[in-house]
């Protein structure tokens, strides 16, 4: 990468006849020298994390010389265009570091073994009798349970906020939302009904399998006052569908660029928003955020909720779209408000 934010790619493939780099929605032709080394330079790229692919003779593949991530419904390569010092909140600093643990468990509802990722704060092993609140944090469509701790830098955000005293120590649990495959509505079916089915298997998993397993395995505070849920994009959709019908289990709710469409705020989820006083008393903190450059309808939703008297904290990430930089910023704004009521 150079100081103008352009990425320079080099790839050795002497037998390939055509190579391209697919990055940030644009395909760049690569040029081959006499020794079989291909090179390409991109336009200046926006800051933040971006997926990219190599296209070798028409076949899209990952870059074997870089780290891989699960995104775009497949294994992908990724590139980080660095911010300035304003991005230090998601970078590792000289502070105590927590752990991200990979946990395998059996889901009775799905009759399968599953994996979740669990962040424990740096002090977790130091205080063996202390119990912790829990945030359940969901990825978006086409990603999986690793997204928040790799693309999202969640663990560094947590470490830095806890060390600065802005955030209480907590566990963060990340599971697959069962939305790794693309959303493909069936022909002739109502689009909103099809959306309701996409990833719906996860709702019983989190309520009947995941939460009980976490409470058995880790030292958690098990009441609703110490349980939160948030998610990005389709994870925001899943957060609404999990928490709003089950406010007996959650008291903190967050949606980052939530894929929440076609809802009548007065009647959705059995009219949960129609009783503003009741909702505001039960939900300790309600957060909605998005980027200024995306069109997810979040701001209009906030306006509708405010008209009904719902207390909601709204955040806009300036200059960003439907991307990980937006969601990192949303998480940074959301976390300091948890478990302080």
Region annotations inferred by a language model:
Residues 1-28, 32-341:
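Non-catalytic cap/lid and distal C-terminal segments of serine-dependent acyl enzymes
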